[in-house]
Amino acid sequence: IYEKLEPGGVFAIMEYLTLDSFTSSPPHKSFDANTAAWNNFYLNNGGDAKIGTYLPALLQKAGFTIESQKCVGGMSPVKHRWWNWWRDAFENFAPTFVKQGLMTSTDFDELKDHWKKQEATETGFIYSAIIVQIVARKSY
């Protein structure tokens, strides 16, 4: 990417800092099984769900100057947009995790049940994966 950018060109990146922060309140084993499945899915497919922890150093080593970095994510109560986004992600990806043996169908069924119970009480929340946003610039 560095070689393809013009001098002064900007590279904006949004990547996982960590998926390990991902949890629900109250905690539930099916939620934790899903979080582990996400991590293993990335690892099994050449990815790294902790890339954000060392991405700034990789960018600097390549010659970029880091202009901005911040983290997003955090608490998402029931019906928050991130709550809804993750619900949809679970429903879309969990069957793949089950098919690949990364989580059991029982865990998936329990996760759906846990999610519905949380939505009904309106007191539950998730603490989402932390994502790092980086703006890096190629030297002039």
Language-model features and meaning:
Residues 10-80:
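Conserved catalytic/acceptor-binding region of the Class I
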Residues 49-53, 60, 65-140:
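Conserved Class I S-adenosyl-L-methionine
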Residues 2, 23-26, 126, 131:
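Generic preference for hydrophobic/aromatic residues in regular secondary structure cores
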Residues 1-10:
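A short glycine-rich, Lys/Arg-flanked "PGG" loop and its adjoining helix->strand segment in the class I
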Residues 5, 26, 30-34, 85, ...:
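Short acidic-hydrophobic sequence patches enriched in Asp/Glu that either
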